[in-house]
Amino acid sequence: MEIQKLTKNSLWTLEHYARVRDKFRKEMIEHKKSRMVRLGENLTLHFEDAQTIKYQVQEILRIEKTFEEEGIVDELEAYNPLIPDGTNFKCTMMIEFSDEAVRREKLKSLKGIEDKVWVRVEGRDKVWAIADEDLASENDEKTSAVHFLRFELDEDMIKSLHYGVGMSIGVDHTQYSVSIDPVSLDLRNNLVKDLI
């Protein structure tokens, strides 16, 4: 079995999307909720899959009124890498502070946090995030408020998750340390669907 990436044929035309958008958005809101985890008050992980990425691409094409093949292919090339490959989980990490001044200061103190997020399969070592591949996510002063993370699992971990063992998720940064052990069964089961 191979994880399918999106193609031009897996997307709807702008006209068709306009007709189904309201229904699809409602479905995606529920789907995304089942794949989201909050770590404390200020950090959220949104685990991606083909459906969440299809929604993002459809929305971008709609907003930009893109219908030419070249523009569609460009969006697919940008977003397909965010779909899990069958041996990993991929997520968008959001660092959220409502006050702009507080956010600026916190992003300074949280520099490097993207490398301190982990997933652990029960009975195994932590799997640390591989963050922002091919992207600059911080500068000398601060981290970014949005990061793209990948958690690469070995064959034994994948088999264990398919067998039904628990899973935990956390972050171990000196300025922000939170864990959920175990994560909800609903989240765990949704993420296991990403694995081959």
Residue ranges: model-predicted function:
Residues 1-88, 96-196:
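Long, contiguous binding/interaction regions
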